[in-house]
């Protein structure tokens, strides 16, 4: 490449970076002045976007933007038309890079994966990634430079859409890696540092209801988590349909969180009416189960908000007859009045159709103290919304185990100025060094967010 070409290329990169920086800055400025219908009602309250102003779209996203959505903000069903507008994925443009708050740095930890989905950190620091569509679980390991994977190996293959991953028992020396396939839970014998499964998979739970196509409403992801004492295992199972068509009964063992003993015995339904808890996690201090949930489609742009919530034992969360309390789904008029007053209102409502996926509590020590104990969640992005939302990682403030009810954009920038999408966050995990690791099945990358203070 000649000198002139190098100068031209450099200018293009610089211009691209400036364009994306300008878009991010404008988004932050617009966040207090949403456009169109979003400008109705009170937009801010103490620096937090509220009411219709909190609904917004990707143009109001930027690191540090805070939102609070309540049931009082919900529009009526069908107030806007239900649209089919999935993202048009494009290669990452020159100069495009995820945006994070000041003092943080983003590095591409690994590239070229096959649609990386959920990710979890092993006690020794290895990162286990589900490549669900390829039927694999992969192991990534940093080298001397923490910002780049030096080891990239397939731990197990020929699995059936693996998603959830968990190490058992808790502590520095687990004996098993559990993997949740779409129709079963299996486990592999494991010792710290294993890059390959040392034995074939042992089936622990053989009969989880599986199948379904996500776009058509059927949900195939299964996450798993263990109680703090290791005596129980939770498995999340999404609904088979987007809107259940039978008025009085519900799909068997779907739209539930199931509970088992670690050996697969002792089955019971822990909580129900949770349409699709893609991500679950146990709070490290309180021991409470939390879930990151995708709500239903077809009722308009701002119905029904996704949510992140503590999950109450025996609790009913509404699906398919109600949503977010005693709000009846109009597609099930008059159905199940006996359950109306039992519906639990979730803790934190997220912009509708954001597709909230994996969640994780921050237990590291690298980030500033104000992040300790807060939750992070990956928002994969909308398809059933005229104005795109999601395509980001959010932070959910937690005070002594109790969510405050608001959330904050933490990692944005995955949408181009033209509205095309180049990245879709799926998984989040806290690395052993305290950095935050994010999987992105839009660009097939794994990102590392570290705090530098600069």
Label each residue range with its predicted role.
Residues 10-22:
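Bacterial N-terminal signal peptides
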Residues 42-101, 174, 186, 221, ...:
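Beta-propeller domain segments
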Residues 97-98, 124-149, 193:
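Beta-propeller domains
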Residues 108-113, 154-160, 204-209, 213-216, ...:
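Surface loop/turn motifs at the tips and blade-to-blade linkers of beta-strand repeat domains
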């Amino acid at each position: 490449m000649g000198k002139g070409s190098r100068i031209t290329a450099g200018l293009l990169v610089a211009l691209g970076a400036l364009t994306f920086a300008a878009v991010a800055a404008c988004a932050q400025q617009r966040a207090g002045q949403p456009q169109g219908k979003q400008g109705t009602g009170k937009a801010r309250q103490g620096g937090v976007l509220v009411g219709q102003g909190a609904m917004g779209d990707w143009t109001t996203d930027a690191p540090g933007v805070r939102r609070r959505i309540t049931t009082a903000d919900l529009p009526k069903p069908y107030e806007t038309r239900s649209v089919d507008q999935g993202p048009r994925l494009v290669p990452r443009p020159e100069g495009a890079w995820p945006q994070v708050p000041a003092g943080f740095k983003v590095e591409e930890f690994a590239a070229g994966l096959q649609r990386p989905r959920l990710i979890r950190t092993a006690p020794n620091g290895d990162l286990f990634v589900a490549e669900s569509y390829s039927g694999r679980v992969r192991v990534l390991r940093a080298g001397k430079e923490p910002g780049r994977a030096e080891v990239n190996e397939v731990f197990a293959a020929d699995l059936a859409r693996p998603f959830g991953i968990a190490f058992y028992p808790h502590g520095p020396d687990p004996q098993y890696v559990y993997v949740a396939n779409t129709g079963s839970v299996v486990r592999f014998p494991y010792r710290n540092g294993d890059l390959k499964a040392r034995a074939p998979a042992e089936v622990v739970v053989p009969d989880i209801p599986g199948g379904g196509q996500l776009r058509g409403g059927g949900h195939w992801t299964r996450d798993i988590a263990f109680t703090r004492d290791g005596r129980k295992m939770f498995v999340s199972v999404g609904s088979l349909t987007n809107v259940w068509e039978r008025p009085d009964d519900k799909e068997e063992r779907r739209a539930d969180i199931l509970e088992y003993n670690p050996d697969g015995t002792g089955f019971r339904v822990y909580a129900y009416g949770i349409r699709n808890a893609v991500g679950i996690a146990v709070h490290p201090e309180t021991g409470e189960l939390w879930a990151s949930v995708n709500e239903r489609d077809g009722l308009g742009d701002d119905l029904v908000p996704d949510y992140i919530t503590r999950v109450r034992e025996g609790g009913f969360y509404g699906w398919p007859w109600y949503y977010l309390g005693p709000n009846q789904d109009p597609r099930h008029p008059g159905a199940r009045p006996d359950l109306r007053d039992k519906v639990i209102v979730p803790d934190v409502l997220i912009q509708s159709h954001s597709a909230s996926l994996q969640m994780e509590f921050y237990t590291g020590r690298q980030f500033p103290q104000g992040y300790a104990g807060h939750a992070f969640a990956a928002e994969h992005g909308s398809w059933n919304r005229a104005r795109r939302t999601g395509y980001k990682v959010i932070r959910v403030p937690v005070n002594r185990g109790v969510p405050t009810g608001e959330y904050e954009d933490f990692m944005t920038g995955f949408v181009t100025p033209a509205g095309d999408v180049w990245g879709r966050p799926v998984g989040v995990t806290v690395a052993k060094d305290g950095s935050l690791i994010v999987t992105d099945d839009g660009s097939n990358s794994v990102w590392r967010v570290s705090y530098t203070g600069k």
